[in-house]
């Protein structure tokens, strides 16, 4: 396998499937199947999930809610998603641990880097919830931060499009996809890969990012085997 340890970033919206809100059990089971394929081959897997299918702090702030309060609500939404994914993975026989940046000891371990790494070394899947534990930071930033901390080989950002394009492919049929692109070119072209904080953290730590279509069966396995899927962002 090309990658021994990965950090998989999933958006909360991805868990909605065809719904307008919440969690689609069918989509959850599909993702669990995809993850199981690489888990069974010995890939060490850490996961960060967003919470946008339940609540997004910045959206609450735009409607008059206190931003800090909204962000904490969003963190709790990621914990709900993490619990849902944990249940789906364990139903398929995979040992998992949910670690949260906020202490919620009845349902999750507190995030401790050394403990997370030990779990990964024992082939347990580790799901990181509650973002960074601080307001004003996105789950993309949390994903890169945790990826750097646990020494992941790569950040795999699963989305509903098959890579990075020069313009939005859902709005422009003439959009051109990049197979490989440098961090510098992403910034120069103003491409929307991750928020600036997350992206800069990844660049500074030379942690590559692969943006790919998580909804296409087999993509996750192909990437871990070294096939050219999605767009690779590298130094």
From Swiss-Prot:
<comment type="pathway">
    <text>Pyrimidine metabolism; CTP biosynthesis via de novo pathway; UDP from UMP (UMPK route): step 1/1.</text>
</comment>
<feature type="binding site">
    <location>
        <position position="168"/>
    </location>
    <ligand>
        <name>ATP</name>
    </ligand>
</feature>
<feature type="binding site">
    <location>
        <position position="71"/>
    </location>
    <ligand>
        <name>UMP</name>
    </ligand>
</feature>
<dbReference type="InterPro" id="IPR036393">
    <property type="entry name" value="AceGlu_kinase-like_sf"/>
</dbReference>
<keyword id="KW-0808">Transferase</keyword>
<keyword id="KW-0547">Nucleotide-binding</keyword>
<comment type="similarity">
    <text>Belongs to the UMP kinase family.</text>
</comment>
<protein>
    <recommendedName>
        <fullName>Uridylate kinase</fullName>
        <ecNumber>2.7.4.22</ecNumber>
    </recommendedName>
</protein>
<keyword id="KW-0665">Pyrimidine biosynthesis</keyword>
<feature type="binding site">
    <location>
        <begin position="132"/>
        <end position="139"/>
    </location>
    <ligand>
        <name>UMP</name>
    </ligand>
</feature>
<dbReference type="GO" id="GO:0005524">
    <property type="term" value="F:ATP binding"/>
</dbReference>
<feature type="binding site">
    <location>
        <position position="51"/>
    </location>
    <ligand>
        <name>UMP</name>
    </ligand>
</feature>
<keyword id="KW-0963">Cytoplasm</keyword>
<keyword id="KW-0418">Kinase</keyword>
<feature type="binding site">
    <location>
        <position position="165"/>
    </location>
    <ligand>
        <name>ATP</name>
    </ligand>
</feature>
<dbReference type="InterPro" id="IPR001048">
    <property type="entry name" value="Asp/Glu/Uridylate_kinase"/>
</dbReference>
<feature type="binding site">
    <location>
        <begin position="9"/>
        <end position="12"/>
    </location>
    <ligand>
        <name>ATP</name>
    </ligand>
</feature>
<feature type="binding site">
    <location>
        <position position="56"/>
    </location>
    <ligand>
        <name>ATP</name>
    </ligand>
</feature>
<dbReference type="InterPro" id="IPR015963">
    <property type="entry name" value="Uridylate_kinase_bac"/>
</dbReference>
<keyword id="KW-0067">ATP-binding</keyword>
<dbReference type="GO" id="GO:0033862">
    <property type="term" value="F:UMP kinase activity"/>
</dbReference>
<dbReference type="GO" id="GO:0005737">
    <property type="term" value="C:cytoplasm"/>
</dbReference>
<feature type="binding site">
    <location>
        <position position="52"/>
    </location>
    <ligand>
        <name>ATP</name>
    </ligand>
</feature>
<dbReference type="InterPro" id="IPR011817">
    <property type="entry name" value="Uridylate_kinase"/>
</dbReference>
<feature type="binding site">
    <location>
        <position position="159"/>
    </location>
    <ligand>
        <name>ATP</name>
    </ligand>
</feature>
<comment type="function">
    <text>Catalyzes the reversible phosphorylation of UMP to UDP.</text>
</comment>
<dbReference type="Pfam" id="PF00696">
    <property type="entry name" value="AA_kinase"/>
</dbReference>
<comment type="subunit">
    <text>Homohexamer.</text>
</comment>
<dbReference type="GO" id="GO:0044210">
    <property type="term" value="P:'de novo' CTP biosynthetic process"/>
</dbReference>
<dbReference type="GO" id="GO:0006225">
    <property type="term" value="P:UDP biosynthetic process"/>
</dbReference>
